[in-house]
Amino acid sequence: MSDHAMTALITGAAGGIGRVLCAEFRRAGYRVIGTDMAGAPGIACDHFIEADLKAVSRDEACLKRFVQQLNIPASGLTALVNNAAVQILNRTDTVSVQDWRDTLDVNVLAPFLLTQALLPYLEKAGGSVVNMGSVHAIATKPGFVCYATSKAALVGLTRALAVDLGGRIRVNAINPAAVATPMLLQGFKGKDAQFSALGGMHPLGRIAEPAEIAQVVLFLVSRNAAFITGAAFDVDGGILSRLHDPD
């Protein structure tokens, strides 16, 4: 690709949503830089970097090395998609301090530090940031104390950055509900009734496809969204609008 091509950095590139994000961004003409804990076959990246976001968020030297490894072109960075996350499930009486640190470092601090470190490149390209929130930022269930708190914080960070950075770059978030990733589908293997029930909880009658999430992200980083910043889009099939009272 030329030095003037659109460039996107996508974290969590090896995951179910991340892989599709990479593929859809490349299809849309972006040069894609992907990063994750470890590489895997079939990731549609032009450049892949193995990186532990816990280390990146805890060690300034590690963060600097990571940014150098990105090899961002002279034209700058068009899109930063903070997609990586950890989900540690524990009830209140068993959550540890380490659970909190691991969750907040990856899900909140890393998106902030990457936005901060890459701000000059994003400004140069007139770029924007999309943070991957979750419906758990708004409505959650038992066992998700750390995860739900971190996603609520990430949505709050999105709004705060949008206000603080003003017209320099745009910052938005999306809150997906259940998504048909390979990991989720494997978890429901042989459990057709439970999978059908999960889809039925959404007014649209199904869960999301990863490509549907990717298309919302692509819209938010496009010029068609030039007047949108500080927003959090619920890509949830209507589940947050529905009461689940017994019939």
Regions found by a protein language model. Name each.
Residues 2-33:
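Canonical Rossmann dinucleotide-binding motif of NAD(H)/NADP(H)-dependent dehydrogenases/reductases
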Residues 120, 162-167, 226:
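Alpha-helical segment proximal to the catalytic Tyr-Lys
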Residues 115, 150, 158:
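Active-site helix of classical SDR
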Residues 91-92, 96-101, 198:
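Substrate-binding pocket helix/loop in short-chain dehydrogenase/reductase
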Residues 173, 193-228, 235-237:
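C-terminal helical subdomain
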Residues 139, 229-247:
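Short C-terminal tail/terminal secondary-structure segment
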Residues 134:
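Residue(s) in the substrate-gating loop at a strand-loop-helix junction
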